Amino acid sequence: MKLLKYPRQLHDGQLLAGCVVGGLLVVVGRDRISAYDCGKLQAAARGELAVREVSAEVELQVEVGEDALRYVAGGEGELVVAGDRQIWAAGADWRSAGRGTRFLTVAQLAGGACVTDVKADGAGLVFVSVSGKDEVWLYATGAWERVGVVTLAAKPVTLVVDPLGELLTVVLQNRSVAVYQYNRQGAVRMHQQLPQYVQTNPLRYSITMSPQGDLLPLVNSIKNGLPSAQLLDRTAGFSVQSTLVGYVDKCKILRFSPRLYEKPNKDKPPTQYNLLASSGNEDGSVIVWNTKRTKPLLNAAKVTDTFINDVQWSRDGTGLFAISNDGYLFIFAFHEVELGRLLDDAELEKLRQSVPRLEPLPPPTPKSLAKSEAKPQQDTKPDAKSSANSVSAKTGKKKIAPTVITSTSMEFNEPSYTVPKDLKRRPKQETQTNGTTTKRPKRDVEPMDFLDTNLLIPNISFSKARLATPKVRMNFQYCNTLQQNLVMEVKNGTGSEQKPTSITLTLKDKEKDMVLFQDFTPRFVTICTCGHSFWACCTEEGIVYVYSNTGKKLLPPMIMGVPVSFLEGCGDYLLCVTSMGQLFCWNVKEGKLKFPVNTIYPLLNPSIRYSDDVLTRAENITMCTTTENGIPLVTLSNGDGYMFDPDMEIWLLINDSWWAYGSQYWDFTNTSHAGSSAAAGNDKEDKKNKYWNADAEYLIEEVKKNKKSVVNYLESKTNDEMTRKGLIRNLQRFAKTILMKEGFENLEDIVTLSHLENRLLVALKLNETNEFTKLLKVYCISLAEMGFKNRLDDVLSWLYNDGEYKVGTIANEKREELLKQILVACADIRQVQRVTTSYASALGLLDVSL
């Protein structure tokens, strides 16, 4: 290895960043850009070329005003430089044009916004992270149009680009690390929130991924109280593959070589490995690591009296360039025998092909392109155990990491299982049996020491129902579904008076955002919601605040006494479910309860899951909300959906996953085609056309178009749960086997009618009158075609009302009109004409219809 310090000080002693474009090393500082031939620099370091013969191939100057060039990135077709407030770009001809190169101003920031990093993926996209706005902008080279925006939860510090062109990693100022998936059209979504945390000093990092795209380095990761660099394996869910300990204190640079290396072994296959360079230490050292070893391959200690601003590898992987803060360039020239055999591009491409690719993102909608905003969406579950990691202090004592999380998605704390140690439990009486039975023990309560048993809330520790509660997020936003420009933003403080939590309602506008109101509380806020004329939020302790759109308190703070698991608003109603399963539904406008306090405990199948042990696990609650009329709705992970009837004060079953197996009319929305008639293969048309009726088909299409139908939505959620559990195949087997068994020939008809009857009753309870009338006609047509004469007569008799059919209404429609429509729809079905004829004669329709 040869080391050369370029003798001339560059850019008046201010070199801030560099990048390698083709065979040129591009460095920037002040208002100047210089490009040097990497081959000549390495030849000069080896003594093959006189140093005085090495000079800049290209010298450029940019009109920066009071700004200074701090970032540079580029590819074969572009060169991008940026300062704190401006971004400039040049085309592919900048090398030949020289001083005649024209720089286009891509963006100019104002106010408190500032550029924190610029990266190019080499395939037509440039990423710019902007603080103040807390965003990452995606630009398409050539036209330099902004094609996408990533909205972040905190100030972005560093960007890491995936060489495979799929992932963008963002290091945030709050020490968290987020990974996003992107495509060339600018569509972006959250891929994973990493459990690792980084130090915030130094703030700016220079990080690259491995050339094969499977390793992501994180510098200054906290582990056992010591700074370390962790290499995360992309193919294993970004778990830690190896750790570099030592020589990384206050490190801010970790750059992989663009080539892959191989070391031959005598008795074993050759070992393939990456090389990466780290620097940024206060002593100005440059360290080269072999990813297969725990010790550095090269430790060039104190090559400069100041610190290193940037490190770049040559394209051939044999040269390393370091830029010092005092404006000097250091060239490291290696021989192949020192680093190992260089693998060719074909072998590197083979390794890239072995990395699993992600499912392609859908193209961004025109609406999102107009707003130039791509909101991150989480498609993988964050590691729930990451918040429980313990950190060892210097004293050797373990301290628990804070539960405050930075993810914009909601995570939950598990229910508490702790009780005081002085609590004694009655021993179980063991029954003597001849045989030995093995029973899987349930999770028992965990005793722990308390300073005072009064600190423990008995009603939580011994509650029959315990729900998970949301974790505290550092900041999050909640948008009104009806008015997307109304956004409530919560920025949690420290949970004390020194730094209270800020609650802000903002009206987003294209020209200017307007703050409608702001409030402060010395507590952590976990959930937000809104109705037609109110906004509500709850704290970690279970205190609910209700505001008007102008910030006026509509109700005094309501004390739940325990943490809140669900808080949902709709219309004038606010629904609250505590961690003990207590259900509250308030009419905010009138300031009173819709119905007495109830519980969701009956929905968790307590009789089925009852045991002598203390704790049993129930189905997860996937949704808990309310309608505009104040009717609570709940769905479970098994696919069942429920509603609470305020009049009867009991829970009612809306949709049973069993109906998906046999009902012909399951899932009118056809979201997943889960009905048995839709899963029966080649016999689908025969089964569906068995009782085909044009009037019924038309009515079904009308119901299908109703996007506001509660039952349609709940049935689609049932299908989602069944798809998630892989039960869709069972539907196909059901349609082919059980319907052919003896004694089950009419099972499909019975399940279909049961499903329709329940939908009718639920629609009537939910006051969905239009859907009720259509379903009633479909139900009567089905009864007529299946030959259920007595049941059809029962329905017609209910409508006839002992001859008082001209008095009163059903679902806002006159009984007489509804009865006439049903009789006309069933008039052509011969097997029920005796039933329909008698009612048609009573209504005076017989002569007209005949």
From Swiss-Prot:
WD repeat residues: 5-46, 61-98, 110-149, 151-190, 255-299, 303-342, 519-557, 558-596
One Pfam family, short name: Hira
InterPro entries for the chain: HIR1-like (IPR031120), HIRA-like_C (IPR011494), WD40/YVTN_repeat-like_dom_sf (IPR015943), WD40_repeat_dom_sf (IPR036322)
Xref: SUPFAM superfamilies: WD40 repeat-like
Region feature (Disordered): 354-398, 411-444
Biological processes annotated in GO: chromatin remodeling; negative regulation of chromatin organization; negative regulation of transcription by RNA polymerase II; negative regulation of transcription by RNA polymerase III; nucleosome assembly; transcription elongation-coupled chromatin remodeling
Biased composition (Basic and acidic residues): 370-384
Recorded superkingdom: Eukaryota
Repeat as UniProt keyword: yes
Localization annotation: Nucleus
The entry's keywords: Chromatin regulator, Nucleus, Repeat, Repressor, Transcription, Transcription regulation, WD repeat
Predominant location category: nucleus
GO MF annotation, one: transcription corepressor activity
GO CC list: chromatin; cytosol; HIR complex; nucleus
Xref: Gene3D superfamilies: YVTN repeat-like/Quinoprotein amine dehydrogenase (2.130.10.10)
Function: Required for replication-independent chromatin assembly and for the periodic repression of histone gene transcription during the cell cycle.
PANTHER family linked: MEMBER OF THE HIR1 FAMILY OF WD-REPEAT PROTEINS, PROTEIN HIR2
Protein family (similarity comment): Belongs to the WD repeat HIR1 family.
Annotated protein name in UniProt: Protein HIR2
Species this chain originates from: Eremothecium gossypii (strain ATCC 10895 / CBS 109.51 / FGSC 9923 / NRRL Y-1056)
Organismal lineage: Eukaryota, Fungi, Dikarya, Ascomycota, Saccharomycotina
